[in-house]
Amino acid sequence: MTQANLSETLFKPRFKHPETSTLVRRFNHGAQPPVQSALDGKTIPHWYRMINRLMWIWRGVDPREILEVQSRIVMSAAERTDNDLYDTVIGYRGGNWIYEWATQAMVWQQKACAEEDPQLSGRHWLHAATLYNIAAYPHLKGDDLAEQAQALSNRAYEEAAQRLPGTMRQMEFTVPGGAPITGFLHMPKGDGPFPTVLMCGGLDAMQTDYYSLYERYFAPRGIAMLTIDMPSVGFSSKRKLTQDSSLLHQHVLKALPNVPWVDHTRVAAFGFRFGANVAVRLAYLESPRLKAVACLGPVVHTLLSDFKCQQQVPEMYLDVLASRLGMHDASDEALRVELNRYSLKVQGLLGRRCPTPMLSGYWKNDPFSPEEDSRLITSSSADGKLLEIPFNPVYRNFDKGLQEITSWIEKRLC
C-alpha cells in the first residue's frame, strides 16, 4: 500500500473520535501559574497543549511553520470541547490539532515522493515524520487519531532512514510477558561494532523524535544510537508503565551481546526527563553493562513526591503521567500516591552509592526538575558530574549542553 493510500485509509473523515483533552478525566486544579521550560516548552493562554517550540525547532521545524499551523487552529470556527481552548476542536477536520499537523506532514510527504535527489527526499520524509509526531503529541492512551498519526510517522521515518547518511536497522527485542518491542539502531559510517548510546526518552515523545541527537552529536563521533519507545507509547504501547520503569530497557541491554553491530562492552544510557528515571535505574541495576549514564532535566524524585511541585505543573503534563500509569479517571489524590512510588529515592536507589559514572544537566528554576534532583544523582555516583545549563539564549545553551554531555559520554565509551 502506498504512503498516500495509507493516509487516506487511516484518516477517514469521521467526527466521533474522542478529543485529546477529554481522555484523562481528573479533577482540575483551576488556575495555574504560567510555566516555561527548555525541554517542555511553555503554557500559553487558551491552549491545552504546551507549545514546545525549542524542541520542535531543534527537530527541524521552521518557526514560521509552527505559527502557520497554530493560526489555522486558532481561526477554526468548528465545535470545541472547551471554547476557551483553541486546540480542542472535535473530530478530524479543519482546526483539529491532529488534522492540521497531519495535513502539514502530508505536504512534506508529497514533496518527498516527488523529489529525485535521495538525500533531499530523505530530509523531506524525516520532516514529515516529525510533523506527524507533533500531530500525535502528547500521545495519550486511547487517542485513536494520534495513534494513526504515530503509524504514519513510523512509516515516514523508515522511508527517511533508507535515504539519509549512515545505516538504520529496525530491530525486535523479546520481553517476557508480551509481544516483542521494536527499536531503531542508528549507525554512523564505518565498520562496527560501534560504541552505542541507549536512548531513554521523555513520556511525551516518541523514539523517532531523537534523530537530531544522533545526527548532530553522536554520529560525528562514531557513536551509534539505539532507541525504543517508552512503556505505553508507540511500539511499546501494549506495555504499561510500572514502578519497574526500566524493565524494557534492561531486556534490550541484556540482548546487546547478540547484536553484531553494537560493541556491548561500550554502552551508555542517556535519559531525557522521565527517561532519566529509566537511565538512573539502569545505572544501579545493570552497572556491569553500562560505562556511563547521562541525564537531562531528570524526573527522578521531586516531581513524583512533592505535592507543591505537582501543583506547578500544567494540566497536560499531569494528564500524560496519568495516561502512562493507566489512571485515566483516578482522583488527583490517587495519582499522587501512585507517582510517589516512582521516586527513585522512595524506591531506595538514589542516595545509595552507585559505581556507574553519572552526569546530570539541569536548568535553574525548572518546574519539572529542580537542581536538587540532579545533585542527588551526581552525589550518589562514584564518578558524578553536575552540569548547569543557563536558560538564555535557550537554543544556543541547549546545543552547548548537549555537546558537553556528548563529550563526557565519548570519554567513557571510546
Swiss-Prot record:
Reactions mediated catalytically: a carboxylic ester + H2O = an alcohol + a carboxylate + H(+)
EC assignment: 3.1.1.1
Entry GO MF terms: carboxylesterase activity
Matching SUPFAM superfamilies: alpha/beta-Hydrolases
The keyword Transcription regulation is assigned to this record: no
Keyword list, A-Z: Hydrolase, Serine esterase
Pfam families: FrsA-like
Gene3D superfamilies noted in UniProt: alpha/beta hydrolase
Uppermost EC category: hydrolase
HAMAP family, per database record: FrsA
NCBIfam families reported in the protein's UniProt record: PRK05077.1 (NF003460)
Family, per entry: Belongs to the FrsA family.
Function: Catalyzes the hydrolysis of esters.
Name of the molecule in the record: Esterase FrsA
Originating organism: Escherichia fergusonii (strain ATCC 35469 / DSM 13698 / CCUG 18766 / IAM 14443 / JCM 21226 / LMG 7866 / NBRC 102419 / NCTC 12128 / CDC 0568-73)
Organism lineage: Bacteria, Pseudomonadati, Pseudomonadota, Gammaproteobacteria, Enterobacterales
